[in-house]
Amino acid sequence: MIILDYGTEVAGFPFISTSDVAAAVQLEFKYGESLVALSNPIGDGPWTFSNGLSNSFRVETFNVSTVGYTESFFIQGGQRWQSVRLLTNSSVTIESIGMRATGQHTDANELPGHMTTSNDIYNRIFDLGGRVVQVACVDKGNAPSTWEITDKGALIRGQTSAQSAEGVLLKAANYTLSFDTKITRGGTGWRVGSGISPIGPYFLLTSNYPDNNAFRNTNRTLLPPNTLIFNSDWSLVNQSSLPTPGNKYYPLNITVEEEKWHHISTSIQEDGYHVQLNGIEIAVVALPPPSNDFLFRSASRYEGTWGFGAFQDQISVVSNVSVTAANGTQIYSNPMTSQKVLVEYGVAPLNHSVCLDGAKRDRLVWIGDFYHTVRVLAQTTARWDYIIGSIEYALSYQVDTGPFAGFVPISTSLGTRPEYTDANPTWTGLVDYQDLFLAGIGEYFRYTGDTKGLRKHWDSIKKLAEARITFIDPSSGLVAGSPEVPNPASFLGPANGSAVTGLFAFTMDLLVPLALDMGDAEVASKFNSTASGLRDAINDKLWNPSLETYSLSLGSPGNFSLTGIAWAMLSGAANGDQASSSIRKLEELRFGVGYKTISSDEKSSNYQLAPNPSGFLLEALFQTSEKHQTNSTAATLHLLDGLWASMVNNDSYSSGASWERPRECDGNSEDACRMGDERAQSFYRGD
């Protein structure tokens, strides 16, 4: 076995170049952001939340039979470590091995922005951001489709399934999905009754694994041959934050041959899912228990779209897809031979240069995380084309009508196109992400003064900002809900709260210079007065003298939060005395190497600290120290020397990129802060 250490987070297409092959060899590549991930049979994967125009699995197998260059079909999103294991009893001479990068890959000290201090830990912390924005920002054209369209149908390699947007818009229920499939290797997979996200009834049909084509590392316990396997959730195996129930297995008394066409149908009926193979019923799968969690899944066990995608290293062709209603009417037909299929199933090639939340996961354009990205990119790579590309990408999906008119999706998937915006209405969740997106635009303008680049988007930006103003509660003056959306969800804190109100005041202030530069003085005045009114409301309604800081919200006056303190300071609502008092109050949130998010949170060994909101706090501490000469040194050092230092001080878990959510830890023990998915939202912050 060979173990490769790339030294820091990298992303791209894995490749190997050989100069001598004694006979056909099978090589297993395994990837991990941390070294310890390589000890796991499936690495630090799979990633089953989104397709991401990348490999969902962190293990892939290569069959090398000739000398020369071999490259993976899939992008591996982000990793520092890689192992290479020879599976066959033969030999191979390797000339080179590595990743064909999908983005910029420059040493941190050679970037346009780089910080050097007398403290090596701080230097390494700052470098985390420069690393992440290089691997998480992807150039247009560098993320091709994960499907291939042929004259026989869609050639689909094993990955998280991709769902039909047409099926979502049809609101199909109690239907029969039928299709033709040819297994090239291992198996073929499909869904029915699914959300646009890959969650819902999932079926996998395995082949007979012929000796001349099967990989030696196929897990035949998880994937027995000639078997129909079913799971009702995300995948066949657990992913760290997406647990799944146990699989159901239906062994077949027939041989499922590879390189032969098979006809499959799955019918959603009252007593379960009826599955036929070549006209013979092979299983009746009982309906899963009803679920109250409709955040991503279909609202009914009988309703939802369909999708396709098999498991690790499997390949199949899917064609002649047909959906028939319970009354026998055909409601959908697709030979799967047109390039339009890629758009419908959300796997079209990337057509914008954009920044994702992270290279490995979620590989979505999260507009809330975008704010962090702007700040970090400004201090490191200065690749402004990624920022304007992300702005254009998000705004192209802007909602025109309805209660959320003006909003944009909070987590646009790679591979989608605006014509299917309504199939994935993520704008209904975490409404304060709209504010963070607007704040990111304001910061971009502050850094660049790019009037020309933003002018064509000004009407859309203004429309979103005006839409958010309607979410100010007229009775409290705080940010809450609108008449059409009275109870929205937020990320930073509850409605009528210090965090969401402070953020929106901050956002309004940032947009004033942009409005003035666009010659829109009336709008600039409105934004300015809105920000002023929000600051007054925070102090009038949420400053709690007995608590000596800002209350979490009107509904929870006895609690306070890290984000409420941060945004009260960043918005300018807090004066010097209020800021000093709030900083002292942080000691009550202190936990391990960081701070709890909310005062009422219970401490436990599984509590996950949050670098994302802690980044807002760190910035607030720096700014308040400069503006009001507050004594914020202890709190600042606690974050730098604890939370962020834990990302760089243990080489077994350090990837050279920032973490999303380390668990409670002290930063010194062997197990300290070892859990952390690298995402762009988690950067070191500050100018």
For each feature predicted by the language model, list its residue ranges:
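Extracellular/oxidizing-compartment recognition motifs
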Residues: M1-D357, A405-P409
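Short, charged/polar micro-motifs that form catalytic or ligand-binding hotspots
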Residues: Y6, S72, K360-R363, L377-T381, ...
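Glycine-rich, flexible loop segments associated with nucleotide phosphate handling
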Residues: W47-S54, Y302, P425-W427, E602-Y607, ...
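Second-shell loop/turn segments in exported
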Residues: L111-N119, K360-R363, V374-Q379, P494
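Active-site core of glycosidic bond-cleaving carbohydrate-active enzymes
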Residues: P198-Y202, W366-D422, Y433-L438, G442-D687
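Internal amphipathic alpha-helical repeat/solenoid segments
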Residues: C355-A359, D422-T426
